[in-house]
Amino acid sequence: MKKFILPIIYGTLLISLSTNAQEKINGNGNVVTETRTTSEYDAIKISGFFDIDLVAGKEGKISITGEQNILSAIIVEVEDNALKIYTKKGTNLHPGMGKKVEITVPLEKISELSLSGSGDITAKSPIKNDKFSAKLSGSGDFDLDVVSNSFDLSLNGSGDIKLKGSSDNLVIKLSGSGDIEAANLKSKNATINVSGSGDVNINCSESLIARVSGSGDIKYTGNPEKRDVKVSGSGSIAKG
């Protein structure tokens, strides 16, 4: 019996120590706005619960609004040409009731965007680049306006993605339970792969390659001349 009890006690102790090692920071209610200055960037990587607005403008002046003691634990830095925004290691942030952390990020031209967490990212102006990729992992949401020759999008989580704009070559990979609404993003060639329970709605005009191996559905508008579709799960592929 001791052989079974000792590992359980040891595991419980480790969990307790890990929890106690986290510095819990409760919002103090004092909402302030700070400007964080960085170098330029061509990628944006967010990890956390923040609400992010992407706006057109000169890169390097990041506006961040929230409770003062919460902001002190949020890191904004550029590393390897990527703007990274995340919480300080070892902290557990708890904003006050109804309080948020809102961040405005100016951009001129970025090639990559990623969010890991429960925050939301909204593009207030079009993201324009020849090649652009976006990745969402977690329960957060994307609302993006994209103009790109080549656009790669990945969703792994329960968050939802809403798109508009245009792309000659669109690639979407969905492996979570979230949905992708891209009927307002006009694409010429679309390659869609759904292996989760989420749904994808797209608009393509020339060619469509679609695969469903999960329970999600793919709906498409437009009249692609070339269609290569295959369903190996319980989902479906249909013209909307």
Predicted regions and their residues:
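Extended, compositionally simple hydrophobic/Ser/Thr-rich segments
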Residues: 33-35, 41-54, 102-104, 109-240
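Short acidic/polar N-terminal linker immediately downstream of export determinants
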Residues: 4-12, 16-71, 88-106, 122, ...
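Solvent-exposed adhesion/ligand-recognition segments of exported proteins
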Residues: 73-78
